[in-house]
Amino acid sequence: MQNHPAHQEPRRVLGSFFAPKSQNTPTWEQRKLGEIAVFSKGVGYSKNDLCEEGTPIILYGRLYTKYETCIFDVDTFVKEKAGGVYSKGGEVIVPASGETAEDISIASVVVKPGILLGGDLNIVSPTAEYDSAFLALTISSGATHKYLSSLAQGKSVVHLHNADIQSVSAKFPTKREQEKIHLLFGKIDTLITLHQRKYEKLVNIKKSMLNKMFPPNGASVPEIRFKGFTDPWEQRKLDEAFDFTVPNNTLSRAELNQESGSVRNVHYGDVLIKYGSVLDVQNDELPFITGRSKDDFKGALLQNGDIIIADTAEDETTGKVCEIVNIQDKDVVAGLHTMVCRPKNKTAEGYFGYYMNSSSYHHQLLPLMQGIKVLSLSKTNVQKTTVKYPKDKAEQQKIADCLRRIDTLITLHQRKLEKLQNIKKSCLEKMFV
């Protein structure tokens, strides 16, 4: 009797990626890892042995902090001791210790020979019929990963032994197909690395520009300026430049929703993590207040140019701000753990959002933060800080526009990076069931 398709074991094929599916597509063979590889262990060395230069080494912690499917080179070194284990090239390494069972079942290939393999590393050397990178992907993904995670033992520290890895069964296509899969993920990883570097470069450029485009402590002009602007900048106490009478609310996350409502709420957690220096009300996502209308918030509705300060955080990001722009017909209020600063005089859109997130301003807040586990700022203390700004609104606008363009590029590369990571995740889920 023929089984119903829904009850048949899924065939491990990659037709959708490499070739049209057909009856002749070879199925994948199931093998115990103990039958296809030689197992050994790394020897000695810990992070206390690391030094600036010496013999290159891989410690098990690298697989958690700097994971790569294929390790071509390393930037950690030790002074060589007798009895060390060196890579020959092609070894698959799996950490023998970790903090969680989920994290411990990961594997990398050591491509380069001559690298010391430290203690707490399981070393798996597959026979010639099996591709090392494919084996690493198999251990790190799908059913094999889940099964190995279930074998990890321990509480505060979990352990995975070579015997555990040897006992696992996994499915393998032909060597040629293994290599194709390995090459596919290599290309995806290369693209991810490329966009990660571009993203990090732009983040560093922005950080540098924030430092150089605003006057440092004690200076009246910034390090770099746009051509044609030479006048000293204005300096004012914050409560001279801004009005602090716009109230916030104390609504919790439980009183907000993402679906519907008539009034939107700026939550301090979103200021700290989600929003940039400029909050575009028409284009950024703001939660709605459940079951309330604007009549409930008379005198509290925000305007373009309002600065929202997050007055509480777990670290020195306390005091991060966002400037409200493009509000149009939306009704928005400031939420829990925020302060509203409304400029007394019109300024260029975005200027104060960027300025008050720069070290030029934020350094004033650091000695004012109070608390141990949670840091907070009082309105009284914040009002005593000073702000600096060019008299000419054209210069203000050029500064804001420059930084917004950098932010746009950062967002673009971040989205590309996320898209590639999602593509990789999808491929792993489809290839390693």
State where each predicted segment sits:
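Sequence-specific dsDNA recognition surfaces
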Residues: 34-46, 61-91, 239-255, 271-306
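Short, ligand-facing micro-motifs at secondary-structure edges
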Residues: 64-75, 92-118, 133-137, 146-150, ...
